[in-house]
């Protein structure tokens, strides 16, 4: 269900000496600008393109055709979102920025370790390092695409090593049903085989920072009966 007009914000594009505006859901508009597959119909509060949204002054089909090469308001809206700016409130911008920072810090926590200890840095410590380094985060850019630049910026403050771990696991047959789907969420199964007793044996590659979480999940799923062996640590 589209956002109501009173909760929508304006997305604005100035081009060819003209201004074009649409009313959008700020969070879905952000997702769209990040490259996520969000139907334009769900983003728009109303299926119109305006010259001035506050006055309700709509753009004519002739104007849209002349400048955008189409009079379809949905196609024009996509162009406005891609090339224009979303007019967020200060609180919306602050919340989106905090959410994106924490997401980026969580990605780093999962994929990087402290080379001195082999363990991941806590998310809050990574966030503090980002603050100390004065890292710029773009709220309209995909979070994972910003991770490399963030790692580069905080490395002088926080030693980091990108790493994956390769682990051999054997799960008794009694627990395979409940463990199978959960285990696959952690990483990439490199190879697997089944024992005559129904046990599941596999080698999995996981992000370096989730090793302890992986072991804890295995123990919970198998009541401590899973057998594991760390085969390899691979730097990225």
Swiss-Prot record:
Q: What is this protein called?
A: Ribosome maturation protein SDO1 homolog
In which organism is this protein found? Thermococcus kodakarensis (strain ATCC BAA-918 / JCM 12380 / KOD1)
Similarity field: Belongs to the SDO1/SBDS family.
Query: Do you know which PANTHER family this protein is assigned to?
Result: RIBOSOME MATURATION PROTEIN SBDS, RIBOSOME MATURATION PROTEIN SDO1 HOMOLOG
Q: Which GO terms describe its biological process?
A: cytosolic ribosome assembly
Which Pfam families does the record match to this protein?
SBDS_C, SBDS_domain_II, SBDS_N
Question: Mind telling me which residue stretches traverse the membrane in this protein?
Answer: none
Which InterPro entries does this entry report, sorted A to Z? EFG_III/V (IPR035647), Ribosome_mat_SBDS_CS (IPR018023), Ribosome_mat_SBDS_N_sf (IPR036786), Sdo1/SBDS (IPR002140), Sdo1/SBDS-like (IPR039100), SDO1/SBDS_C (IPR046928), SDO1/SBDS_central (IPR018978), Sdo1/SBDS_central_sf (IPR037188)
List the taxonomic lineage.
Answer: Archaea, Methanobacteriati, Methanobacteriota, Thermococci, Thermococcales
Quaternary structure per UniProt? Crystallized in association with 70S ribosomes.
Determine the domain of life of the protein's source.
Archaea
């Amino acid at each position: 269900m589209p956002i109501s007009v009173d909760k929508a914000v304006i997305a604005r594009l100035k081009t060819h000496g003209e201004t074009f505006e649409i009313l959008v859901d700020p969070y879905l508009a952000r997702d769209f600008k990040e490259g996520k597959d969000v139907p334009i119909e769900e983003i728009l509060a109303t299926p119109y393109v305006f010259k001035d949204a506050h006055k309700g002054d709509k753009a004519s089909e002739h104007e849209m055709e002349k400048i955008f090469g189409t009079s379809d308001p949905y196609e024009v809206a996509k162009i406005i979102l891609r090339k224009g700016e979303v007019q967020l409130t200060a609180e919306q911008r602050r919340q989106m920025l905090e959410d994106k920072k924490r997401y980026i810090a969580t990605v780093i926590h999962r994929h990087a370790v402290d080379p001195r200890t082999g363990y991941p840095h806590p998310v809050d410590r990574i966030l503090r390092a980002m603050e100390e380094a004065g890292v710029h985060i773009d709220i309209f850019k995909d979070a994972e695409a910003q991770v490399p630049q963030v790692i580069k910026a905080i490395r002088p403050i926080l030693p980091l090593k990108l790493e994956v771990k390769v682990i051999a696991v054997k799960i008794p047959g009694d627990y395979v049903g409940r463990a199978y789907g959960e285990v696959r969420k952690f990483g990439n199964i490199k190879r697997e085989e089944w024992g005559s007793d129904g046990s599941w044996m596999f080698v999995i590659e996981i992000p370096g920072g989730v090793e302890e979480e992986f072991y804890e999940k295995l123990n919970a799923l198998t009541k401590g009966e899973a057998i594991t062996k760390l085969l390899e640590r691979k730097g990225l």
